[in-house]
Amino acid sequence: MGLFNISLLLTCLMVLAIFHSCEAQNSPQDYLAVHNDARAQVGVGPMSWDANLASRAQNYANSRAGDCNLIHSGAGENLAKGGGDFTGRAAVQLWVSERPSYNYATNQCVGGKKCRHYTQVVWRNSVRLGCGRARCNNGWWFISCNYDPVGNWIGQRPY
């Protein structure tokens, strides 16, 4: 095999490895793993993937690709956007990172910080999940996860 063919083969393998590593961070299992890890930490059972919710989330993400604005659709959802290689796993980790801002005793976000993405992730009654990811016109990624049943009811604790 000539040097050119070996170089071409190595380049193809590297591209496939990069593609696989990016896609591996956006599979249903990746979204579920981060959700279910966070839920297990507070004694809440795991979620399961719902293809219908995923389809709705993907359609909504696609519809936001023009402006990439985090405008809620009205469904029970968490939204995120990010540049570079922003993945579904990274979006869920971003929501889970709000945990220190949630005070269970008062059922409030502390210090004026955000925590309601986190409370939706661990909402006990939300047992089905579907997520979508779309590339925005500005090059960023828009990620939407839908939950069923909807959580984050004002005045109720997530677990």
Swiss-Prot record:
Keywords of this entry: Antimicrobial, Disulfide bond, Fungicide, Pathogenesis-related protein, Plant defense, Pyrrolidone carboxylic acid, Signal
Induction (record text): Upon infection by virulent and avirulent races of pathogens, for example fungal pathogen C.fulvum. Also induced by ethylene.
Recorded superkingdom: Eukaryota
Example GO CC term: the record gives: extracellular space
Classification via SUPFAM superfamilies:
PR-1-like (SSF55797)
Q: Which residues form the SCP domain?
A: 32-147
Against InterPro entries, the record matches this protein to: Allrgn_V5/Tpx1_CS (IPR018244), CAP_dom (IPR014044), CAP_sf (IPR035940), CRISP-related (IPR001283)
Where does the record locate the signal sequence feature?
Answer: 1-24
A biological process (GO) annotation for this entry? defense response to fungus
Instruction: Give each disulfide bond as a residue pair.
Output: C68-C136, C109-C115, C131-C145
What family does the entry list?
A: Belongs to the CRISP family.
What protein name is recorded for this chain? Pathogenesis-related leaf protein 6
Gene symbol?
PR1B1
